[in-house]
Amino acid sequence: MVTETNPARTATDMLLVNRAADRAVEGLTLPIPQGARVFVDETYFQAENARYALSAIRAALSEAGYAIVRERGEADAIFEVRAGALSLDQLRRVVGIPDMRVPINESLNVVSLPELSLYSNRDRMGVAEFSGFLYDARTGMPLGAVTPMIGQYKIRSHKAFMMITWGQQLAQPGERDPGSSWKEF
C-alpha cells in the first residue's frame, strides 16, 4: 500500500522561500571588525521557515569573517535580527475565464469550474526581508543597524489553450537560478 501525504507547503514553496532567504543575506557585513565574536539574537525573528533563514544569516556572517558564538556572554556584539517577510507570493494572469467556485443552491453548495483560457501564466515568488541592529554585548551601546536585507526567487510558468505548457513549473532541488522564462509577458 502506498501512502500519500499532503503537507501544508509543497517542496517548491519551501525551496522558493529558502532561496529568497539565501539571496537576502548575500554579502551581509556588520559595522564591526572581522573576527569579532557575534551572538545572533533570534528573539524577534518570527516566521515560517525561520530556522532556515537564521542559519543562512549565521552562515553569511561566518563567511564574512565573524566568529559566531552560542552564548551571549561569549560575544563582543549582539546582532538582533527580525523578519519583515519570509513567505510566498503568487500572481496569476488569465486571458479567458479563470477557474472559479460557483454556488448552486441556497445551502451554498459549490461546484468548481475549470479555467477556460487562451493563455495564462503563473508567477510564484519567494520573498525574504530581514533587518537588524547591532549593539555592544557588555555596554548595550548601539554599534549600528543593518538596513533591510531583501531577497526574491521567482519561477514563471505559461499555458496556452489550456494544454500547452512551458516555463518552470517547479523549483528543483540543487538548482540555483532558473533565469528568465523563455518569453516574459
Language model region names:
Residues 59, 63-68, 72-141, 149-185:
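Surface-exposed short loop/turn segments
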Residues 1-62, 66, 169-185:
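A structural "domain/chain start" motif
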